[in-house]
Amino acid sequence: MTTEKRQILVTAALPYANGPIHLGHMVEHIQADIWVRFQRLKGNDCLFICGEDAHGTAIMITAQKQGLPPEALVAKMHKEHARDLGGFLIEYDNFYTTHSPENRELAELIYTRLKDKGDIFAKTISQAYDPVKEIFLPDRFIRGTCPRCGAKDQYGDVCEVCGATYSPTELIDPVSALSGAKPIEKNSEHFFFSLNRYTQLLKKWIDAGHLQPQVANKLKEWFSEDLKPWDISRDAPYFGFEIPHAANKYFYVWLDAPIGYMASLKNLSKQRPSVNFDAYWKEGSQTELYHFVGKDIVYFHALFWPAMLSGAGFRLPTAIYVHGYLTVNGQKMSKSRGTFITAHHYLDHLSPEYLRYYYAAKLSAQVEDIDLNLDDFIQRVNADLIGKYVNLASRCAGFITKNFGGKLANELPEPDLYESFLQTEQTITDYYESLNYSKAVRVIMSLADRANQYIDAKKPWALAKEINQEAQVQAVCTQGLNLFKILTTYLKPILPVTAKKVEQFLNCDELNFANLKTPLLDHSVNPFEPLMQRLLPETAAQLTHE
């Protein structure tokens, strides 16, 4: 029976070109990358795109501080971000940028279509203005108390505590983050998107199961009041795209940022003629579209974005997968505590696969924060990856190489044990598919325990010393290495580099779910090389000490 290949497009939220990628960002990129690798392992066509979120006053101001044009800052950060993501084995088909001709063209197209439908209107508003710096203050450069929940020291556009969005003028006791001055109010004409026109569409879309239940319930709270029109413009000076036929007015960064997903695919379609842009984005598309995002940007992705897409005649996402924040040793990441760990700093000291595994062992389909506890991290890596998984291969490989010239036996002594490992495939793939990686890891490690128990019971090291037990030693170790092959296939989305090393050692084709069932028998393997090093506490300690 052949199953038709799924055509899937996956995006991760665009890192902002204003600073380094840290381990909090990596939760999402690793989560998405594991899912993409799993889909490919299942034989599905899965494109994976991302890019640099390149616009906004924050970029402009950071560039000024560094004495660079904004374009140069964006190019520099794009290079650094691509390096760090690549270092963590995140394999994008295209890592592009929102400061691109494709994004300008698509932003103008979507804006024009919305305007032609009557969804855009102009209104004079009172805006926060820094009298010292003589600049209209972007939302993120105003801090104050949330008008909805009363949380202090919140941004001017969104509360990180309750998730409310609001205009900066609604903030209580605001101050400029640039000068510390109390902003004054100044009038300016802005353009608004009539989000309330899409209330029924959004309610229906949210009810249709495109979001995790927790997220859907949270969004429904926002419908208790009328959805407010969304301010999509900003005044010069600003780094971004000018709004057509509107002097000194620019698209707000959050208008063109998600359009960057489309632009990245459009750019990829120019590089790869086989990639059809319309197949993924046209209205009524039968392909699948998934966005991986953090809980802090749900409002933009699950309300504004579907409304914009619908209004402009494009397809809506199949699902938006939302994850929580990362804490380190139980607390919010902090530079003063040494727990603000950049991706680059981590990669200077440790293997990316350690963190990929640790995150996978913690991630679920829930919108829960996960904690990087360094003691637990060391223990998990050493107990699971080294003590259970790698140890299984190292216990068997030496006998096969030394005593049998690298040749495996021609049959399995315990085919039922092998079959029982295969029977967990559906459970594990269901867990991967539903983002319940922690459950998948638990099942895989319980299999590793069983495989090691088998070797413990058969004691090939003792058999090797007995007369006429050579065939039994070869058979036991062949069984062990074939169980190891299954475990490696199951772990491959999480540990791609290790899986490649295992394929080389086993001298076999690329491991995937299609060839999972076929054991390696009467087959020559290569000499075994160490797959991973034990994680030393002093090495891990360097993460929190510059």
UniProtKB/Swiss-Prot annotation:
Q: Where along this sequence does the record place binding of Zn(2+)?
A: C146, C149, C159, C162
Q: Which Pfam families match?
A: Anticodon_3, tRNA-synt_1g
Q: Please name the InterPro entries in this protein's record.
A: aa-tRNA-synth_I_CS, Anticodon_Met, Met-tRNA_ligase_1, Met-tRNA_synth, Methionyl/Leucyl_tRNA_Synth, MetRS_core, MetRS_Zn, Rossmann-like_a/b/a_fold
Q: Which residues cross the membrane?
A: none
Task: Kindly report the protein's main subcellular placement as a broad class.
Answer: cytoplasm
| EC number(s) per entry | 6.1.1.10
Cofactor stoichiometry and binding remark = Binds 1 zinc ion per subunit.
**Compartments reported by the entry:** Cytoplasm
Q: Which UniProt keywords apply?
A: Aminoacyl-tRNA synthetase, ATP-binding, Cytoplasm, Ligase, Metal-binding, Nucleotide-binding, Protein biosynthesis, Zinc
Cofactor(s) demanded: Zn(2+)
The residues that the entry says bind ATP are K335
Q: What is this protein called?
A: Methionine--tRNA ligase
Task: Tell me which species this is from.
Answer: Coxiella burnetii (strain Dugway 5J108-111)
